[in-house]
Amino acid sequence: MSKSSPIEPVSASDVSQQFRDPGLYLNRELSQLDFNFRVLAQALDEQVPLLERLRFLCISCTNLDEFFEIRVATVRHAQEFGLPPAPDGMRPTVILNAVHDLTTKLVHDQYNCWNQVLCPALASLGVGVLSHNSWNVRQKRWLRGYFRNEIMPVLSPLGLDPAHPFPKIFNKTLNIVVVLNGIDAFGRAGHLAIVRAPRSLPRIIELPQHLSRDGSQNFVFLSSVLSAFVGELFPGMVVKGAYQFRVTRNSELVVDEDEVENLALALRNELVTRGYRLAVRLEIAEDCPIPIVRTLLQNFGLQENAVYRINGPVNLSRVSQVYDMVLRPELKYPPFNPRTVRNSDHIFEIIAKGDVLLYHPYDAFTAVLDLLRQAAADPDVLAIKQTLYRTGKDSTIVDALIQAARSGKDVTVVVELRARFDEEANLGLADKLQEAGVQVVYGVVGYKTHAKMLLIVRREGRKLRRYVHLGTGNYHSGTARIYTDLSLMTANAAIGKDVHQLFLQLSGLAPKMKLECLLQSPFTLHAGVLFRIERETTFARKGCPARIVAKMNALNEPQVVRALYVASQAGVQIDLIVRGACTLRPGVQGISENIRVRSIVGRFLEHSRVYWFANNGTPELFCASADWLERNLLRRVEICFPILNPDLAKRIYSDVLQSYLDDNLNAWELGSDGVYRKLLPETDHAPYSAQAALLESL
């Protein structure tokens, strides 16, 4: 529908009825699996350096693990409790079957990529990851000795009989089920045994180079060594078969925060049992006999649609260790030197003169570290307040906060204990900070604190001035080198006041307060996004140019999706850059033909969130910690901050939005059929990669 077509405003109830058709929505779980295919495509791209292709393969495997631990576990929960279907109309049982079909193809493609493409390519360049049948005599002799000296002493094989029931198997660990024939020392007839590989054992073993005939750097999987020599654990018995397997379990921690008095203690108790929760997936060697598979399924409480046959090591993601162990720069992305802030030794003076925008990893994260380090050492700084979601193991951020507290400054840190898979690390972090005198709070009951905020209060003359850092990504110097994220450092008084009020809400019992500049979940961000989408819709109905460009990691919030459909019908031109799952179906005639959705998958993980609204010639641009997901907009503490400096807003539009819309090398476009297709340069267009162009500009 063209933007000049007369469209009558519709009521909310009419909109709800109009967009009730399940065919207008894509399934979140299947869309998330689609993203893994796009990551895997990078592993097959011959333009990508070989060891980087290996890393992309491992990322796709790790992503799939987390998908089962969280998303599939959630769907199984919905199935168990008979929860209603999502807007796409798919019921949990249908979703699980569809997930199985799509995952089976993904797993096949992953192992085909490893066995047929990457492993042979690495071998041709002198990096061998050797299977059992390719060991030479000297390698096999060395590995037998390694097994006897380093592996065998820590193994505890368990024969299965009435006195030895099926053992507890920890989440995502390597195990071998062994079929035995013979009589043991106590006269028991052998049948099945389980060998668990302790997590203390290395999953990748490097062979001494002198064992190679051609000087190659060679590795073997622990699973290959176990399978080859497992018979030594059962002397006098015949091993009829040894099959590796791995079980994946529900890893979503569940704590009733309204019922617990001590959140940290409750989480510690949950973490103890997390590795043994309900199973959601069984990976098993493809040659394992069906009766044994059924035995495992029965013990794990799984159905046939939870089994995945594996043609290779069940823990394929562990081959990522080879990336770090092979020191071959020509097989990796070339290093780069990110931009640094000039005169960063005087960071407060720089920020006082004007807002500072950083686009990581092209701009170094060291500027953020400098800000905090200088604040910790500056006698004029009176207070520091910060949120921490993920920080990494050796965090300069944490060290600076501790230094500040020990120097007598008032330091308050909101540590989110429920950051997925970082709960244990954050519990330790909270303890460390508290021991140093930092006031630690755990956020708000019922809401994860996902906002990225740093507030520094500094005395300047007779006044106190607030300095603020806001970001789309974590305070994590490691991910800042491989994730794209935006940082704003500002001394803007209105923004500083808003951030101060947010910290009062998080650390105390302050009531909801009206903010001047920032939008905040769970209070104003959802409504603020809807308002701006509807404003563009109104402009389009009046015949004015109207446009929305938004970049995020994922999109599924139903009201936002419906508002975008209404905007499209009114003629608003909408470009969405959504890296991962997207439930909106673009390009549907009469509904969403004015919406285009693309996903960028390249060297760096796209992580920044940016919302741009044309606003009838007075554009508004926001950066945010939140995706357009239900959880982010309604069930988390998030921030969305405006870029008030017009020059900085133009830079973001150019480098972060338009640049990605021009990309024709790393872009995938979502069709109305729900299929992502890789874009290729047209004959009259030069090849263009947004990430490569930004690197070249350094």
Curated annotation (Swiss-Prot):
Binding of Mg(2+), residues: R390, R420
Alphabetical list of InterPro entries matching this protein: PP_kinase (IPR003414), PP_kinase_C_1 (IPR041108), PP_kinase_middle (IPR024953), PP_kinase_middle_dom_sf (IPR036830), PPK_C_dom2 (IPR025200), PPK_N_dom (IPR025198), PPK_N_dom_sf (IPR036832)
GO molecular function terms noted in the UniProt entry: ATP binding; metal ion binding; polyphosphate kinase activity
Protein keywords: ATP-binding, Kinase, Magnesium, Metal-binding, Nucleotide-binding, Phosphoprotein, Transferase
UniProt KW Lipid metabolism keyword: no
Domain of life where this protein originates: Bacteria
Database matches in CDD domains: PLDc_PaPPK1_C2_like (cd09168)
GO biological process: polyphosphate biosynthetic process
Reactions accelerated catalytically: [phosphate](n) + ATP = [phosphate](n+1) + ADP
GO cellular component, as recorded: polyphosphate kinase complex
Residues that coordinate or bind ATP: N63, Y483, R579, H607
Cofactor (UniProt): Mg(2+)
E.C. number: 2.7.4.1
Active-site annotation: H450 (phosphohistidine intermediate)
UniProt function note: Catalyzes the reversible transfer of the terminal phosphate of ATP to form a long-chain polyphosphate (polyP).
Family, similarity comment: Belongs to the polyphosphate kinase 1 (PPK1) family.
Name this protein carries in UniProt: Polyphosphate kinase
Protein source organism: Xylella fastidiosa (strain Temecula1 / ATCC 700964)
Gene that this polypeptide is encoded by: ppk
